[in-house]
Design a protein with these regions (language model features):
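Acyl-donor (CoA/ACP) binding surface of acyl/acetyltransferases
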Residues: 3, 9-127
Length: 127
């Protein structure tokens, strides 16, 4: 699926992740940059609980990096909750560098009082 974007959300592509004929998760890649993308990141993924621990998120991320390159993006911001060890290990395996760990400001469109600090990474894309 493709979403055109609005004032808060960047345009994005949304894909189902399959192993054979079995859907095991979802991944999205957001195109461009705005204030919110620093905290929301350019890639979002979710792997069904019974399929976690198999590097499927990593492999799906590697595939959608090609979409970013097609859109002439040179770097991506990748984020996750500070406590999400599996996610930040995936991000680090992709070669992203940690910029900071920070609680998003109240101006962030998805802000909640109880939200965790976010690990914010930068991934430079090779041409």
């Amino acid at each position: 699926q493709k979403y055109q974007g609005d004032d808060e959300l960047l345009p994005f592509y949304y894909y189902d992740i399959y192993i054979g004929d079995t859907p095991i998760g979802k991944i999205s890649i957001r195109i461009g940059n705005n204030y919110h993308s620093y905290y929301n990141g350019h890639i979002g993924y979710e792997i069904d609980k019974q399929h976690r621990g198999n590097n499927y998120a990593y492999r799906a991320c590697k595939l959608v990096l090609q979409v970013a390159k097609t859109h002439s993006m040179c770097e991506l911001i990748l984020t996750c909750d500070e406590s999400n060890i599996a996610s930040y290990k995936t991000i680090e395996k992709l070669g992203a560098e940690l910029i900071e760990i920070v609680k998003p400001p109240k101006e962030y469109f998805a802000y909640r009082e109880d939200m965790e600090k976010q690990r914010i990474y930068k991934l430079c894309l090779k041409k």
